[in-house]
């Protein structure tokens, strides 16, 4: 009765605290949370079939690539990407990037779409890098070498694309595999 009367009153901008009331279900409207990554990070997304990112993400990564003198080039692509219940979004183009993954030179192909989407890489890229995530010790392993996880503000695991060999930009842990 208290909950019913509290929710049926006109808004008073007061805070009502509800504790220990069985069978109380409050649903919130669908909220959208934008994920903004620091430039140079790509999110590990096991549901992503192909690496993809929005135009703004590509512009940021290309500015950083230019500063570092690292190569990249575009190529034509004819693919569509769908996120949740939204409509399919056509790719504008694809990009080949020369990146540094945990101290190793690598390449990655990332589709560009005209949407506000962070960089996402999928299982194929992660498998190629022999990636293992360890949430217990907060590390990510690629090609047998560990480094600290770089989570997004939403706690999604991210990979830095600018950890080139012999850089001082990250803390790295070597792990001997026997």
Name what the model sees in each region:
Residues 3, 13, 18-19, 44, ...:
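Intrinsic disorder/low-complexity signal
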Residues 21, 25, 44, 54, ...:
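Conserved acidic
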Residues 6, 28, 75, 153-156:
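Compositionally biased regions
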Residues 1-38, 163-178:
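Intrinsically disordered, low-complexity interaction arms of viral/retroelements
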Residues 30-74, 108-110, 114-122:
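Aspartyl protease active-site motif detector
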Residues 76-91:
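C-terminal reverse transcriptase regions that engage the nucleic-acid substrate
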Residues 91-178:
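Aspartic protease core domain of the pepsin/retropepsin superfamily
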Residues 59-60, 68, 79, 127, ...:
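Generic recognition of well-structured, leucine-rich alpha-helical segments
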């Amino acid at each position: 009765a208290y909950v019913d009367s509290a929710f049926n009153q006109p808004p008073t901008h007061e805070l009502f605290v509800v504790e220990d009331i069985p069978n109380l279900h409050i649903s919130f409207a669908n909220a959208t949370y934008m994920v903004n990554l620091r430039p140079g990070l790509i999110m590990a997304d096991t549901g992503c079939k192909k690496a993809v990112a929005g135009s703004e993400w590509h512009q940021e990564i290309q500015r950083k690539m230019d500063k570092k003198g690292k190569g990249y080039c575009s190529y034509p692509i004819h693919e569509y990407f769908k996120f949740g219940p939204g409509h399919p979004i056509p790719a504008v183009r694809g990009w080949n990037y020369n990146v540094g993954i945990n101290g190793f030179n690598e390449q990655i192909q990332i589709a560009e779409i005209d949407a506000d989407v962070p960089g996402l890489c999928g299982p194929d890229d992660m498998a190629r890098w022999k990636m293992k995530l360890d949430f217990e010790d907060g590390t990510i392993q690629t090609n047998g070498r560990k480094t600290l996880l770089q989570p997004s503000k939403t706690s999604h695991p991210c990979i830095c694309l600018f950890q080139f060999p012999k850089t001082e930009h990250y803390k790295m842990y070597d792990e001997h595999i026997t």
